[in-house]
């Protein structure tokens, strides 16, 4: 019976003999399992009493923060937005309304309201009134009054009367009057295609219907008018001479007569 139990327990596993006094194990079959030591080598069964070899200590190296930072895990960074205009949202009507900012301003930061400086600047410039040019007194009078269309005799007489009291300069600036201009043309025989004598002894003369405008322009140049002189303006001045008596209208087309006092003694009838 004991031999059978011994045969069953014999093998690659541990074999033991049972005796009434106790259990005895076979030392050859009951070898302890080997575990790897700190160096990675198998632990020897018979080296239990020996002191394990001291592990090799690496030389001390200086701590390098840059090398450690290369292997450090990146952390999630929270993005901060400025206090500028917040993103816009569309209102139900279709207009673009700015969304209210949910961020509170930090300590020491001032939030200024956004203003449209471009529209304010352009708006004020676009509608700014331009200063009107300053006109002199002489230009003001010329703009308000018709240019040399009033009675030539009356206006010239007024100028002469006012200039006589100013001294010797008045005589040098004495203007040629219209009746004097026409009388000199007729006496010299200039511009015969424009004006001629009808009755020289009576002082009757006549204008040409074709070249009357040419004579009027010549008179405008003589006076130094800025605007173009026309025969209509010249005829208006001739009619005004009827008040002073230098020239009067004759019942004929484009025909006038000088006062006999203006004619030279040789031409008087």
Swiss-Prot record:
GO cellular component: nucleus
Main location: nucleus
UniProt DNA-binding residue ranges: 176-259
Location of region: TAD1 (Acidic): 1-32
SMART domains: ETS
UniProt-recorded Gene Ontology molecular function terms: DNA-binding transcription activator activity, RNA polymerase II-specific; DNA-binding transcription factor activity; DNA-binding transcription factor activity, RNA polymerase II-specific; RNA polymerase II cis-regulatory region sequence-specific DNA binding; sequence-specific double-stranded DNA binding
Coiled coil: none
GO terms under biological process: cell differentiation; immature B cell differentiation; macrophage differentiation; positive regulation of transcription by RNA polymerase II; regulation of DNA-templated transcription; regulation of transcription by RNA polymerase II
Pfam family, one: Ets
Protein location: Nucleus
Start and end residues of each stretch annotated as TAD2: 42-63
Keywords for this protein: Activator, DNA-binding, Nucleus, Transcription, Transcription regulation
Function description: Sequence specific transcriptional activator which binds to the PU-box, a purine-rich DNA sequence (5'-GAGGAA-3') that can act as a lymphoid-specific enhancer. Promotes development of plasmacytoid dendritic cells (pDCs), also known as type 2 DC precursors (pre-DC2) or natural interferon (IFN)-producing cells. These cells have the capacity to produce large amounts of interferon and block viral replication. Required for B-cell receptor (BCR) signaling, which is necessary for normal B-cell development and antigenic stimulation.
Family per record: Belongs to the ETS family.
Assembly and binders: Can form homotypic interactions. Interacts with IRF4/Pip. Interacts with JUN. Interacts with TBP. May also interact with CREBBP and EP300. Interacts with NONO/p54(nrb).
This protein's domain notes: The protein contains a weakly acidic N-terminal transactivation domain (TAD) followed by a second TAD rich in proline, serine and threonine. Each of these domains may be required for transcriptional activation of a subset of target genes.
Protein name: Transcription factor Spi-B
Species assigned in the record: Rattus norvegicus (Rat)
Primary gene name: Spib
